[in-house]
A protein has these predicted regions:
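Edge beta-strand at a domain terminus
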Residues: 44, 91-124
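Central antiparallel beta-sheet cores of small beta-barrel/beta-sandwich binding domains
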Residues: 1-87, 114-116, 120
């Protein structure tokens, strides 16, 4: 079981990450909302036990190849979850928060929360 690799979630978004000494780096390609490739940075348990590896990573929704800032370019998401083998498949089970800038009067609209399940894509 290894966190590094290529992962696909239920929406068809692709995340490609490397992990070195517990540090996660990579890219997240979204196919919902604003399309593009985005930076991923995070941390993982460097010595997982018990068939589960915990991790957390952030995605900055400013496209890696952006020249002009769009409205989503100021959004950031934080994902937390575990890598486990579920029904014979390596699976990332995550919960995420997305925050976007608002006025103080609209702060209640600034954070969204949901779950996302990723399956390994780079192993047949």
């Amino acid at each position: 079981m290894q966190l590094a690799g290529v992962w696909e979630n239920e929406h068809g978004s692709i995340m490609e990450i490397t992990v070195q000494d517990g540090k996660i780096e990579g890219s997240y390609s979204s196919y919902t909302g604003d399309k593009g490739a985005y930076r991923v940075l995070g941390l993982a348990d460097p010595e997982p036990i018990g068939g589960s590896q915990t991790f957390a990573f952030a995605v900055s929704w400013r496209p890696l190849d952006a020249h002009d800032a769009g409205s989503g370019d100021h959004w950031v998401s934080g994902f937390v979850g575990q890598l486990q083998v579920i029904d014979g498949e390596e699976t990332l089970t995550t919960m995420w928060l997305l925050t976007k800038p608002t006025t103080p009067e609209e702060n209640w609209t600034s954070i969204l929360i949901d779950k996302s399940i990723f399956k390994r894509r780079d192993r047949g």
